[in-house]
From Swiss-Prot:
Name the record gives this protein: Vitamin D 25-hydroxylase
EC supergroup of this enzyme: oxidoreductase
Binding site for heme: 448
Matching InterPro entries: Cyt_P450, Cyt_P450_CS, Cyt_P450_E_grp-I, Cyt_P450_sf, Cytochrome_P450_fam2
Tissue: Highly expressed in the liver and testis.
Record gene name: Cyp2r1
GO cellular component: endoplasmic reticulum membrane
EC number: 1.14.14.24
Top-level taxon of the source organism: Eukaryota
Organism of this sequence: Mus musculus (Mouse)
């Protein structure tokens, strides 16, 4: 069969074009991986993938790996995440210096392909620093105050939910069970009251499925394949992989949230909001003639989803760790029981006003927050303009990781940080003392807007459960204490026995 000269020439030209394109891509990637002048030092990196492999193959969890690297390269060091120049901040002093003293510069979010794909850099948590974020944050803060922790009556709603949780636990009659789903349902219902003005029953399988997809995505987002997607977004064309599972989950959640929002808005009366969705729709109406307004149906869905996962995943895991440690350390549990019996008694419900009279219980919860590091690397920041920190030059648009684990295990501020020791939060007279270097809700302009509500939930759920139950592991079977890797650190699945006191 004869091959036409024109066909050979065409094939040759195509091959040459592909080689040229490959060469351009290689050069572009290598240029992206160059460390700028004055940039913080860091470990050696591989071509193209940078430090992704060393992170993924390390025997340590990422936050532990980063802390170890800081001992070699300093409290401020750099990583190359496949061409994404990243600065890691370690220790309380440098984190405070950046997030507080240079708060506006470090208040941005990185334009990572994952965030672009999931939320188009809209919504609330992952939006860029600017008017859109400021407007959404203002609305969320006001909503959490007016429809949540700012209302005295809202405490009674939390207590009602604690009793629904206690009733559900009692059905196991002291036998072993996994409390993850029950606590997740209870905690998420507090956020649901603020967002939608209603709670969901523990038998609502549709809502439970959505929360499970959220939780799965929190784990997937921290996986090596998703880091590779951020570095090389073209792998998104592959029909398989963890990134595709994450996107499928997100699509299901998006559709479900859209239906929830439509249902919540059925009885809406403009300018008389009863929950966050009402208030957001009012903002949409007011912004119809403002071309700069970022309030939209899409951003409403993104914001609601982010508030649900932020309000549920963190508080749920704090309580799961707290209960695990009560069973692990019966002497500590006994002291909490003693304080609850003394201050609250058996016949009264716990109340937020008792918190200041219960220093040991407060100390236990704060030690759980410190020791367990629910969000060890925070949410990634980015620089909104060029910055100089301790003599290092950090260009605009650099991804910044705040290693909160390194803060909470900083020997400068914590004696024997590897020990679970609630007494570190008590003074010589037994009074509770705050510690400056405890920042589980982060610092600066992007600190957690639901901190007050989260603290109220933790205290009321924890004291209510400990008032009613003695907690222990079945057959003294101690669970694996190594946390599951994700954007948050949650305990491995474990069984607990809750016997009526």
């Amino acid at each position: 069969m004869l091959e036409l000269p024109g066909a050979r020439a065409c094939a040759g030209a195509l091959a040459g074009a592909l080689l040229l394109l490959l060469f351009v891509l290689v050069v572009r990637q290598l240029l992206r991986q160059r460390r700028p002048a004055g940039f913080p030092p860091g470990p050696p990196r591989l071509p193209f993938v940078g430090n992704i492999c060393s992170l993924a193959l390390s025997a340590d969890l990422p936050h532990v790996y980063m802390r170890k690297q800081s001992r070699v390269y300093g409290e401020i060091f750099s990583l190359d995440l496949g061409g994404i120049s990243t600065v890691v901040l370690n220790g309380y002093d440098v984190v405070k210096e950046c997030l507080v003293h240079q708060s506006e510069i470090f208040a941005d979010r990185p334009c990572l392909p994952l965030f672009m794909k999931m939320t188009k850099m809209g919504g609330l948590l992952n939006s860029r620093y600017g008017r859109g974020w400021i407007d959404h944050r203002r609305l969320a803060v006001n909503s959490f105050h007016y429809f949540g922790s700012g209302q005295k009556s809202f405490e009674s709603k939390i207590l009602e939910e604690t009793w629904s949780l206690i009733d559900a636990i009692e059905t196991y009659k002291g036998g072993p069970f996994d409390l993850k789903q029950l606590i997740t349902n209870a905690v998420s219902n507090i956020t649901n009251l603020i967002l939608f003005g209603e709670r969901f029953t523990y038998e609502d399988t549709d809502f439970q499925h959505m929360i499970e997809l959220f939780s799965e995505n929190v784990e997937l987002a921290a996986s090596a394949p998703v880091f590779l997607y951020n570095a090389f977004p073209w792998i998104g064309i592959l029909p398989f992989g963890k990134h595709q599972r994450l996107f499928r989950n997100a699509d299901v959640v998006y559709d479900f949230l859209s239906r929830l929002i439509e249902k919540a808005a059925v009885n809406r009366k403009p300018h008389l909001p009863h929950h966050f969705v009402d208030a957001y729709l009012d903002e949409m109406d007011q912004g119809q003639n403002d071309p700069l307004s970022t309030f939209s149906k899409e951003n409403l869905i993104f914001s609601v989803g982010e508030l649900i996962i932020a309000g549920t995943e963190t508080t749920t895991n704090v309580l799961r760790w707290a209960i695990l440690f009560m069973a692990l350390y019966p002497n500590i549990q006994g002291q909490v029981h003693k304080e609850i019996d003394l201050i609250v008694g058996h016949n009264r419900r716990p109340s937020w006003e008792y918190k200041c009279k219960m220093p040991y219980t407060e100390a236990v919860l704060h030690e759980v927050l410190r020791f367990c590091n629910i969000v060890p690397l925070g949410i990634f920041h980015a620089t909104s303009e060029d910055a100089v920190v301790r003599g290092y030059s950090i260009p605009k648009g650099t991804t910044v990781i705040t290693n909160l684990y390194s803060v909470h295990f900083d020997e400068k501020y914590w004696k024997d940080p590897d020990m679970f020791y609630p007494e570190r939060f008590l003074d010589s007279n037994g009074y509770f003392t705050k510690k400056e270097a405890l920042i589980p809700f982060s610092l600066g302009r992007r600190h957690c807007l639901g901190e007050q509500l989260a603290r109220m939930e933790m205290f009321l759920f924890f004291t209510s459960l400990l008032q009613q139950f003695h907690l222990h592991f079945p057959h003294e079977l101690v669970p694996n204490l190594k946390p599951r890797l994700g954007m948050t650190l949650q305990p491995q699945p474990y069984l607990i026995c809750a016997e009526r006191r």
